[in-house]
Design a protein with these regions (language model features):
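Proline-rich low-complexity regions
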Residues: 10-11, 32-33, 118
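Glycine-rich beta-alpha loop elements in corrinoid/cobalamin-binding modules
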Residues: 35, 39-45, 50-160
Length: 160
């Protein structure tokens, strides 16, 4: 059985904050996130072809647009790339939207925010935090979920 996964970039700005018109210019430009795009490539390279990339950071969609995306794209596992600690409120907001749409989705958070993994796991809807490089952990989670589907068992974060 195929595992449907979605990797998402997470904005660093506070939710609801006013964005600059040209976010990619100026002294602190918003740049494409290399780690999450590399992880997406690694996922596809390792045979998990059902992986989509949702660039929330660059698109900066409203809550209703995020909800629409996840209602149209049923995911077994969602990866959130939180590159800085200021992403916390965004992770909290986005993970809540995902769980409201798809309560069975396993939400995985990676990036520097996971230095505070205990807080992220207690205060958000994130199920798993990956600390450090995520390529091996992410494909391991996808393999685990794929095996769980084949054996008709539930993916449980405490077993990982």
């Amino acid at each position: 059985m195929k595992v449907n996964s979605i990797l998402c970039s997470v904005p660093v700005e506070t939710p609801g904050g006013k964005l600059r018109r040209k976010r990619s210019e100026g002294p602190s430009p918003i740049m494409p996130k290399i780690a999450i795009t590399s992880l997406n490539h690694w996922t596809l390279k390792n045979g998990f072809k059902q992986c989509k990339f949702y660039d929330i950071d660059m698109l900066y969609p409203e809550d209703k647009d995020i909800a629409k995306f996840f209602s149209e794209n049923d995911a077994d596992i969602v990866g959130l790339s939180a590159v800085v600690s200021t992403s916390y409120l965004q992770v909290k907001r986005i993970s809540k939207i995902i769980k409201e749409i798809n309560p069975k989705a396993l939400i995985v958070c990676g990036g520097y925010l996971t230095a505070a993994a205990d807080t992220v796991l207690r205060k958000t809807d994130v199920d798993v935090c990956v600390v450090g490089d995520g390529e091996i952990a992410w494909t391991g989670l996808l393999a685990y979920a794929s095996n769980a589907q084949r054996s008709n068992t539930k993916v449980r974060s405490e077993e990982l």
